[in-house]
């Protein structure tokens, strides 16, 4: 079974009103995490036991790739707010601007960093993706041998038909699901630095604390804390995998980030990558599960969320951060 975090459950209950994966926040602290509820969908008036279906068929105008970024909310990290490689500039100071930044980069096939643990991106498609029982969609990362920075995948069906990802998120099962070292509802609070060019401090729901290191020699922007987050602290909630990264050299010069077996983005898996040279990871809607680990039957999905699953850092390489380059419907045809 998973290790489920109850330590700060009362705190989360008081400060969050989770709305379909995006959390409401109080005036002092922002909270972002998966929906705690798992409703089956709105009722059909003619048959209350049958959920309404808002399935969106493909049309002649449809495309295989994602068509919308609904929310880009990274954790702090070395590429956040950074111009040279991160592609940010001084205009990215609102959530809308951040979403547009992410979409423009992904449309060009350029990676977007999710930062440290809990950072995420939500994308949608112009059609519903069918559950075929096999691999249904893929997310592109930038992993390579000994450099895997796994991101967990969540899926959502547009249950209320409003075209927005405000219904129920379901986590997709991966190779680490059910292990004692995997922690559900793991929460990290990030703190805005009081001075420029400083590390970002964090505390977690396990009573631990640490920092996102400031790597001035490589990324010297003033802040690694997202400029569009208005509050001085914010919380990211998700499922945490046990870190596997280690310093092979023993001198801090050569860090290895081993592969996880399967089920994660930006992971150099020999199982779910379609070819040896591919950086795409394939996913099955049939691997969806509820918060208790029970299988969930979804005929289709409309939205995908990718979230950094590791809270760790690798010396001069910095924080372990999932990168996303795109997402597409594997079985697309019209």
Q: Which residues does each PLM region occupy?
A:
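C-terminal motif of bacterial Sec signal peptides marking the signal peptidase cleavage site
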Residues: 21-24
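Sec-dependent signal peptide recognition
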Residues: 7-15
């Amino acid at each position: 079974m998973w290790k489920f975090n109850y330590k700060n459950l009362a705190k989360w209950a008081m400060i969050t009103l989770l709305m379909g994966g995006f959390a409401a926040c109080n005036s002092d602290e922002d909270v972002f995490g998966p929906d705690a509820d798992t409703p089956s969908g709105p009722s059909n008036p003619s048959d209350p036991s049958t959920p309404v279906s808002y399935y969106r068929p493909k049309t002649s105008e449809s495309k295989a790739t994602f068509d919308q970024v609904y929310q880009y909310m990274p954790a702090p990290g070395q590429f956040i707010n950074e111009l040279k490689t991160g592609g940010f500039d001084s205009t990215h100071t609102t959530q809308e601007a951040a979403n547009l930044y992410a979409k423009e980069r992904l449309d060009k096939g350029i990676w977007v960093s999710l930062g440290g643990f809990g950072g995420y991106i939500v994308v949608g498609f112009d059609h519903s993706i069918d559950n075929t029982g096999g691999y249904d969609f893929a997310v592109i990362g930038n992993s390579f041998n000994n450099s895997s920075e796994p991101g967990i995948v969540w899926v959502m069906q547009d249950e209320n038909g409003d075209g927005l990802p405000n219904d129920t998120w379901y986590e997709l099962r991966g190779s680490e699901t059910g292990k004692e070292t995997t922690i559900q509802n793991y929460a990290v609070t990030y703190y805005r630095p009081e001075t420029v060019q400083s590390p970002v401090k964090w505390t977690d729901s396990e009573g631990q604390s640490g920092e996102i290191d400031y790597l001035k020699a490589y990324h010297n922007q003033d802040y690694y804390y997202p400029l569009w987050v208005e509050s001085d602290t914010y919380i990211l909630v998700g499922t945490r995998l046990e870190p596997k990264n280690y310093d092979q050299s023993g001198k801090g010069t050569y860090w290895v980030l081993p592969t996880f077996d399967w089920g994660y983005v930006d992971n150099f898996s020999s199982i779910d990558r379609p070819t040896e040279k591919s950086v795409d990871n394939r996913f099955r809607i049939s691997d969806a599960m509820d918060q208790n680990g029970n299988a969930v039957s979804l005929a289709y999905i409309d939205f995908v969320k990718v979230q950094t699953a590791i809270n760790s850092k690798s010396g001069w390489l910095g924080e372990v951060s999932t990168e996303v380059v795109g997402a597409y419907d594997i079985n697309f045809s019209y």
